[in-house]
Structure formats: structure tokens, C-alpha cells
Amino acid sequence: MSDQFNSREARRKANSKSSPSPKKGKKRKKGGLFKKTLFTLLILFVLGVVGGAVTFAVMVSDAPSLDESKLKTPYSSTIYDKNGKEIAEVGAEKRTYVSIDEIPDVVKEAFIATEDARFYEHHGIDPVRIGGALVANFKDGFGAEGGSTITQQVVKNSLLSHQKTLKRKVQEVWLSIQLERNYSKDEILEMYLNRIYFSPRAYGIGKAAEEFFGVTDLSKLTVEQAATLAGMPQSPTAYNPVKNPDKAEKRRNIVLSLMKKQGFISDSQYNKAKKVAVKDEGVVSQKEYEKASTNKYSAFVEEVMKEIDEKSDVDPSADGLKIYTTLDTKAQDKLDELMDGDTVGFTEGMQGGVTLLDTKNGEVRAIGAGRNQPVGGFNYATQTKAQPGSTIKPILDYGPVIENKKWSTYEQIDDSAYTYSNGKPIRDWDRKYLGPISMRYALAQSRNIPALKAFQAVGKDTAVDFANGLGLGLTKDNVTEAYSIGGFGGNDGVSPLTMAGAYSAFGNNGTYNEPHFVKSIEFNDGTKLDLTPKSKSAMSDYTAFMITDMLKTAVKTGTGQLAQVPGVEVAGKTGTTNFDDNEVKRYNIASGGARDSWFVGYTPQYTAAVWTGMGENEAGKKSLSAEEQKVAKRIFAQLIADVDDGSGSFEKPDSVVEATVEKGSNPAKLAGPNTPSDKKLTEYFVKGTAPSTVSKTYEKEEKEETAKLSGLNVKYDKDNQSLTLSWNYDGDATFAVKQSVDGGSYSEIQNSSAKEAVISGVQPGSVYKFEVTAVSDDGKSTASTSYEVPKAEDDEDKKDQQQTDDEKQDDEKTQDDTQTDDSQKDDGQTDQDQTDDSTNDQDKKQDNTNTNPSDNNNQDQSNDNDNDNSNNQDTSDGDSNSGKNDSTGSDTNKNKTDTSNKTQTNSSSIEKTN
């Protein structure tokens, strides 16, 4: 057995040597790789920790120290105008510092439940809160929830800038931990509650309680009041309980639910507090809130603080901010003078709102918040939501159709009886129809039907997209066809700020800049934050230029003439809105009374939107009279005259071509060589769309000029005491013969196709004057002559001699007649030339009359609204004397008749009727 065992053992060893096991080899290899990987990771971890520690140390090495004066005594912030001049200081004088012992538990708990539920558990930073914020941001988007603790907020607002950098965040974490080590929780909470921003006039819980509830003893604050205040820091403007009670109440109820969740209040307390409306929980009245202020730029400053709050993550309560704004104090002073003075025609109860922008960059230079408006009151420049009237037409109708359909300024639109798509008729204030008119004329005269047709041509969706690109923020589902003429429904409306921003893009080659009040912020550590919005292209340059050129016409000869400024290139549009039938009866609105009156206009330098309407007044007046509707245009004109030096112009881009077209041609045709000057129009076309066909309308007139009545001759028959009148005419015509005897009036004696007329029973010694007019399909031709009948003689020889002389004289006169006609034709100085000239002058004067609207009738009372919820329509701001349009006209000319005292003088003229 032993030998056998040895033999097997020997064989096993031999096999082992000759065939190594592959499995054992792999196991040894895996073990080595694992050890190497583990060792490598360990090395990297150590290096990472060391590197992180070094990096952390470097980042916090220059972190500011915990300066107790900055932590407990907030510094004020300074606001500067566009030139860097200080205009206001905010913060320090708006605080009432209270100690933690003066702050009741209900207030502390309301803020802790809302801002930092684990405040008493963490050591400056809260990993649980940070994790929750990360999840919320992942689910709902970046910024959905913040991860900062109350401690971090104190550090950030007292010691650091708001730059979104890793270094700043690391320093914030480090300083928060240090703050927790050096100060108690109550001390940190006291710092926080005394620096929170509630409004430009209220920093800290002490001032806020007084500002919104009239409470100076914080122990008297109720649960619902504490919850309302705790809900405000997230968005102080939106959750202001005086200005926005509904939003404030929704936010307060969220805070109450958080307080209940954290066990700070019971279910019964929660239910009781939730039932109390914000307006019933002791909020001060609007009048109490509208306190006087020593700063004359307070309305502008409020918008500055509001913009910082809404458009950045900068806390306005942060210490030592330097806020650089867009304010032009000179313009603001002038606007205040206009709004509160009596130079523009304001009447008792009238209100107004104005926004003045820089056309090129959207910077707000001045605002008219209202007439004698108290600080903190309603801001008519930024908060108004009024129907825009006809000022919407460039934005929602003509701008989109030029951009997408490339309509020219000459595009012919039929202003005839028309209805909305739902069958409801649409009308203009004058209840008239002008027939085919150009887009330029339609916009300048503010006609409604062409505007609706332009809107329909481009389509609602495209039109709304265009308008929203200019900042209007319309919802497509809400927009009806009535919007095309300014009949907004529901809660839709526009402010002067919105309209100024939209119109400025037309004056800026199609580039839109969102209106803004703040340029930049400098923090107490010297870092800066640029808040200038990015520019965006809202339309093609050809759209911007063509709208601008048409709006220049609206100011020169249309409804906006009162807004003209000498020496300044102005483009702009009027707009008025009216009342529905029920409101007219309810408020006893006078005929022509308007709800709103607008003027929105711009120059190469400035854009201004002006709204006027009736505010609260003791008389209860609701509407603007025709005279009061002029105020908006006067404000614009006087403001621009003061701030604009007239430099700059609206330059035609290469994408636009100019063409002289024949008035009334449709489609457009170029004016021909014979087109009368008063039938020529210079219009603009998108490059590649201009007409190439030359009109031939007036060519036939030149060719048929020779078809004149000529050779008018008179022969006397002594025996029959008659005169025979004859003439030449090449073609078919009807001839009207008129006669005058001895200077009397003309009377028609014959009207036929015959080319002669016999006048019997003539009286010797009398002078007969004749006028013959040929009337044909090609026009009219008139000639005239006169003849003196010889007196009777007793001497037969003398009679014979006289007869011979008369016959000779007749022959000479016949020759003279022919010479006279020829010379008149050669000289080209016929009576007809004079007649045409005078008629053209008269036509031009009539054209001027027809395109020069009266400012007394600048409203468009169109009671047609496609929206059942709103019957308010735009007025077309037209003129009852506007008459017919710019695209049709009559060429029929009246004749002058030249008669003389010669025995016989012929003259001829021609008049063509098309």
C-alpha cells in the first residue's frame, strides 16, 4: 500500500509540475490587483483629504472676521443715479432695533418654522436641510428651495457678497460654524430678526410690525400676524399684506401649516388663525400705509428695491450695498413738474402714469407714479393694467404682418363693412368706411377694420408670439380678435412700463431690452453684480423701420399731431378705450367719453408711454372728455422737448427699399412718366418685394391730346338775320352749345352730335358769345368764341360795301381763328393748362384737408368686442373730417372759360375723365 501510495503521490507531483493549475494562478493574480486598487484608493483618499484641507484653508484664509459691529448694527445702503450721484440712503433709518427678550415666542417660532426648522439642533449648517434642498431643486428646478440656515443668512447678509462662487460658499460655511461657536442661538436669532428686509421702508421685525399692523409692542402680535410677517421675506413685494392681501393670505396659511407641523401651535390655533382674512387681522389701511417721505425719488427707489428683490438673489437688507440705478434726475424732476402741475390740462380727479426709457438700452430714466401720489401708494407707471386701445396695433397687428408677410407700407387694405369671425360687426368711431386704403394711412388714422384684417392675415398664434417677444406676456387662450384693436378682456392689461419697453424695440432696429431700474450692485467687500438684462432680437430691422416710418406719419398728419416736438424726429401712436353700453347707462357717460387715453411714442434717444384716466374723485367721475384726452399727448411733447436734444435719426436699413408708386394702384405699380405728381406716393418695401410694373394709367391721355375741338367759326347771314356756328372734332362726341348775349349769363341752346349750330333772329349791334363743349368717353374738350352783329345802314352802296368788308373780315377772322388755335397749341399755354394747374392745387389742398385730422375728435368709439367678458374697444382716434382715403381720387377737372371783347376769339381746352 505504501508503495502504491508513493507512486500516486509521485505521479501527482509530476503532473503538478508539468501542468500548473490555471485556477490557482488566477486567484493569485486577483488578490494582487485588489490589494493594489485598495492601496491606490487609500492614497487618493489621503491626498484628497489633505488637498481638500489645504484648499479649504486657502479659501477661508482671507475670509472676513466676525465683526460684531457689522453683525449687530446693520449699515445702510446707498442708491446712486445714472451718473453716480447719490440720491438716497436706505436701511439704517428704517429700523427699530429690538432685543431678543422683546420678541415673543410666537414670532420666533413663526420664523424658525418657515426659515430653519432645525435651528436649535444644527451648528451653523444643516446637512438635512441641504439634502432636502438638493432634492427639491432636482425635482422642481434650481432655486426651488434654499439650503441656507438662519445662521448662514446672517453671515451672508452681514459679511459676504452674493457672488455664486465656491470660495464664497466655503467662507459662508466656515463663518457660520465660527458664529455658532462664538454666539448663542438667541443672539444669532436676534441678529437675523433685526435685519430682515420687508419693504423699502421697513427693515427688521420691529419696524415691520409698526409698518403693516401699527404695532409697536411686539408682545401684542397675534398668531396670524406673526405668520404673515414670517411669510414675507421670501418675496417682500409679492406678499405685502397691504398691496397684495390675497397672495399674502395664501403665504400666511403655508406658514401656519409649518408652525403646526413643528408643534408650535395646536390644531385649534391653526384652524382659528386660518379663518381670519389678512385684511381682517389688523393690517393698516391703504391711506395709513401711504406715508409721506422726505425723499422726492421715493417712487423710483421703491421700484429699485422691488427689482433687486424679484430679479436677483440679493437680499435688499444686506449691509453696505451700493446700488447703481438708471435714474436721470433732470428728467424725473421735469416729469414730476408735469404730473403735479397744471401745464398739461389735468382736471380734478384725473390720474396718469408715465415711463421714460432710453430707446437704445431699456434703462428707465424717470417714472410718473401718479398725480400728487403719496409714497407707497399705487404706482400708475408700473402697476396699471389698462386696455391699450389703438396703441396695440403696431404690436399685435401691423408689426407681425410685416415681419411674417412682408407687407409694404403701401399694402392696400379694404376698409369696408366687415365682421369678426363670430359674425359680430366691427366698426370705427365715425361709423364710416373708406374703401381701399394703404396700411400707412390705416395706422395713421387708426382705422379698426384694416387692423383686424392684418391680425387675421398673420394669425393669432404668430401675432401673440410677436407681442410676447416685446414683453407683453399674453396667454394665447385668452386672446380674441377684439385684442387686435385693444379690446383686452379678463385680467389682461398693460402698464406704461410694458408699453414703453415694447415700443422702444421699434426705435432700436428691432432689438428688445427689458425695461430696468438697476444697472449693478456693489457689495461691501468691493465685488460687483451686473443686473443689466440681456438684449434680444424681437423682429427684423425692416419691420422696425417700416413701423417707425408709419408712426412718424401718425404724428405728422394723423391722430398724434399734438405730440409733435419741433426739431425732434418723433414716431408714436394714440389710443383710447370706451365703456360698454351697460357702463354708459350706469355711470351716465357723456357722448365721446373715454375710459383710458394713451400716447406711446419714441425718438432715436427716448421712449415714453403715457396713460391717463380718472382716479378716485369726490364727484365720482369715470370718463375723460375730449379735451382731457389730449393730456397724454401734451405730457409726451413737453417731456421730450425738455430731455431730447434732437440728435440722431431713424436710418433706413439695407433690407428696405424705397419706391414711388401710383396712388390707388392695386397691386402696387410704379408711377409712370405721365403720372401726375399728386398721384405719386413714396412708400417702403422689404427688399425683393418692390413692384417692377410701371403704371400706364395716364399714357392714353397724352396720345389722345390731339382729339380736341378746334376751328370754331361764326358766319353771319344778313338776309336771314342768323349766325351759323361750326367747328371741327376728330371722333364721336356730343356737343353742348351755350350762348351769352351782351354780357348776360350763359344758357344752353343745343346739345347734339351735330358739328354746327344756327342761331336765328340775331340783333344787329349785339355781341354774342359762344361756348362749345365736346363730351366723349375720352374726356371733355371746350372751345369758345364771340361775334358782334353789324349795325343796319341806310345807304345801299354802303351796305354792299359793308357786306363785302364783312365777308372779307369773316375770312380774315376765320384765318385768325385757326392761327389762334395753333399758337395756343404750340405755346402749350391753353386755358386748360391753367385749369389743370388750379385744379391740381385744389386737389392737393383737399388731400391735405383729408389727411389732417382734428385733434378734437381723437377717439375711436368702436363698441365691438369679440370677448363676451369685455366690451371695451379701442377708439380709432380718427377725425370726422378725414374724408376719403389716400389711395383714390378723381381726375375730373373743371374748365375755365376765357371770353374777350374781340369780335371773334377762339380758345380751346381739354379735360379728361377716368
From Swiss-Prot:
Residues 848-892, 900-914 have a biased composition (Low complexity). It is found in: Cell membrane; Forespore inner membrane. The product expressed from the translation of the ponA gene appears as two bands on a gel (1A and 1B), but the specific amino acid sequence of each protein is unknown. The N-terminus is blocked. Residues 708-795 form the Fibronectin type-III domain. Residues 329-662 are annotated as: Transpeptidase. Pfam families: Transgly, Transpeptidase. Residues 1-29, 773-914 are annotated as: Disordered. Pathway: Cell wall biogenesis; peptidoglycan biosynthesis. Residues 59-914 are extracellular. GO terms for molecular function: penicillin binding; peptidoglycan glycosyltransferase activity; serine-type D-Ala-D-Ala carboxypeptidase activity. GO terms for biological process: cell wall organization; peptidoglycan biosynthetic process; proteolysis; regulation of cell shape; response to antibiotic. Disruption phenotype: Cells require increased levels of Mg(2+) or Ca(2+) for growth and germination. Approximately 50% of cells without the gene contain abnormal FtsZ rings, suggesting it is involved in septum synthesis; increased levels of Mg(2+) or Ca(2+) only partially eliminate the septation defects. Double ponA-pbpA deletions spores have greatly decreased viability, peptidoglycan synthesis and elongate poorly; increased levels of Mg(2+) increase spore viability. Residues 829-840 have a biased composition (Acidic residues). In the N-terminal section; belongs to the glycosyltransferase 51 family. This is Penicillin-binding protein 1A/1B. It comes from Bacillus subtilis (strain 168). The lineage of its organism: Bacteria, Bacillati, Bacillota, Bacilli, Bacillales. The gene is ponA.
